[in-house]
Design a protein with these regions (language model features):
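Ordered alpha/beta subdomains of enzyme catalytic regions
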Residues: 1-192
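Glycine-rich phosphate/ribose-binding loops and adjacent secondary-structure elements
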Residues: 171-191, 196-219
Length: 219
């Protein structure tokens, strides 16, 4: 039965083990048919999926050891799962997907952080992913050491206010020659807790618009 809004697989489906590769279902069926329940130690290695995500395994009779989120590493297993294989076999696909996606984002964000160690760096990556996983993107950016993120609903999810600048759309709505009016309207409209960051490249080059913004807004 297919009832997916926006092609989103529900958390309940993921926890149930249905969000898996077909061969894991067939493996489970084969082991059940053969009446085999092997005790195993599964390792997640560094060339696959670094970091830890335990909630998916919380209701299963397994022991999990892993390095904490945000820990830098250089080779070796980063997670071990010990227990009856059939208890978590169907969860492998979802588990590795959770770890791989988040750690890939964190690694990329960390490279930016290291390239600009003394500058404020914000994540605007949510516009490039499915909206249902925006909180994954923004949390991963924070784990990497970025200073903030742009996505409002993600902020609700992880209990941290979103931040950002202003979009080109705002300047375009005011029109060419009205950049000062747009910057001043933004300054007047937003709260005192919002940073004033004027976007200075919509109609003219950055130098020209930066000078105009400084003149229009002052200190």
């Amino acid at each position: 039965m297919r009832d997916l809004e926006l092609d989103i697989i529900s958390p309940e489906t993921i926890h149930s083990g249905r969000a898996t590769d077909a061969y894991f279902e067939r493996t489970d069926a084969t082991l059940a048919h053969a009446d085999r329940t092997p005790q195993v130690v599964a390792e997640v290695t560094a060339d696959q999926f670094p970091t830890g995500e335990f909630a998916l395994l919380a209701d299963h009779a397994v022991d999990v050891d892993a390095i904490p989120p945000g820990r830098c590493f250089d080779g070796g297993p980063v997670m071990r799962i010990s227990g009856p294989y059939r208890d978590f076999a169907r969860l492998e696909t979802a588990l590795l997907g959770l770890l791989s996606h988040a750690s890939g984002i964190t690694t990329a964000a960390r490279r930016v952080r290291e390239a600009a160690p003394d500058s404020p760096v914000l994540s605007f990556g949510a516009r490039h992913v499915h909206p249902s996983i925006a909180a994954v993107v923004e949390r991963s950016a924070l784990v990497a050491g970025l200073d903030g993120f742009s996505h409002v609903a993600a902020g609700d999810q992880i209990d941290r206010a979103a931040s950002g600048t202003m979009p080109h759309a705002l300047l375009l709505c005011f029109g060419r020659g009205e950049q000062e009016a747009a910057w001043q309207a933004f300054d007047a409209a937003v709260g005192d807790d919002t940073q004033r960051i004027a976007l200075c490249d919509t109609f003219s080059d950055e130098v020209d618009e930066s000078l105009r913004a400084a003149d229009a807004l002052g200190d």
